[in-house]
Amino acid sequence: MTHSMLRLTGWAALAAAAALVGCSKKEEAPGAAAPASAAAAASAPAAPLKIAFAYVGPVGDGGWTFAHDNARKALEKELGDKVTTSFTENVKEGPDAERVLRDMVGQGNKLIFGTTFGYMDYMLKVAADAKDVKFEHATGYKTSDNMHAYDSRTYEGAYMAGVIAGGMTKANVLGVVGSVPIPEVVRNINSFTLGAQSVNPKVRTKVVWINEWVNPPKEAEAAQSLLNGGADVLFQNTDSSAVLQTAEKAGKYAFGWDSDMTAYGPKAHLASSVINWTPYYVKTTKEVLDGTWKPSPTKIWWGVKEGAIDIVSISDKVPAELKDKLMKVKAGLKDGSFSIWKGPIVNNDGKEVLKKDEVADDKWLDAITFYVKGVEGKVPGGDKK
């Protein structure tokens, strides 16, 4: 019923009341319309929560951004008309990220996900000016009253891939294409190496950095240089499938990263370490919808235990015995009985960084700037422990 119809109804009631009992009842008739108006407002469906995602790469990268966008789609499917989502891809880490984030606020989004490390300071700045908006920043460490830092334990997937790599290499030389030398990526390289060493102590790991998250030509060039240097199994912490495709062409082995990349190199593919962001995105969105979202002074971590990290599409080339070892590791990560970063662990200078039975906490893991024993070279700008 429109407001004009309500007014007509009110005047009709007034006239009828006046005819029956006189002028003393004139003020009651307009009041009778108010409950109907309030009921109509109460029954109207709530507007959907507007959610925006800022992506560092294209949604078709087959890796990192692809995984985030799959989770966005799953979020829409699960929550239906309670939410409406949008995304902006290829948002570079730099001042332009702030512009994009401010645009998202201006468009009325009340929950914004920034999905790469380099957005951190820009998101923190925007969050300070938009207190009615909730912000979620992936892989960073800074937080505020309306901004979370969240991360997946990708190093668990890296370790599991390493178990396979250590058992499959013939040359005992592994190659890793690194993206940006921040603790997250260094941690993954080290965890991959530790996993390989758990089944083959002779392995050593070579690393080539491209200093970008996604650049397929550079990724392919780096992969080829590692193959030329003697590596026969490749791993990556970059966002496209170029490393796997390079291994496929060379008749060597490699892994998928962040998403299942089997289709890009079915002969080379040994397994894919994948991230499922959906559980976290659904949980966080529900908290915003029902008003239970709360600040967290520390980063929120999700891994194998929470269903965020897995290793999938394991090749038939991987022997059953090696698969059994892998499944035991996965089970231990799931129930908490196994810790990847448990001492003794030494860096590649021979310095003990974790004593026997000492287990690294999340703060320690988030500050790794060294290579473990078995990884060649030095971390660019690192090696502080």
Where are each of the predicted segments found?
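Hydrophobic alpha-helical segments within soluble ligand-binding/sensing domains
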Residues: Y150-N172, V274-W293
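Bacterial signal peptide processing site
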Residues: C23-E27
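Periplasmic-binding protein-like
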Residues: G108-T116, E136-A138, G229-T238, W257
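Bacterial N-terminal signal peptides that target proteins for export
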Residues: M1-A12
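Flexible loop/hinge segments that line or gate small-molecule binding clefts
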Residues: A128-S152, S259-K267
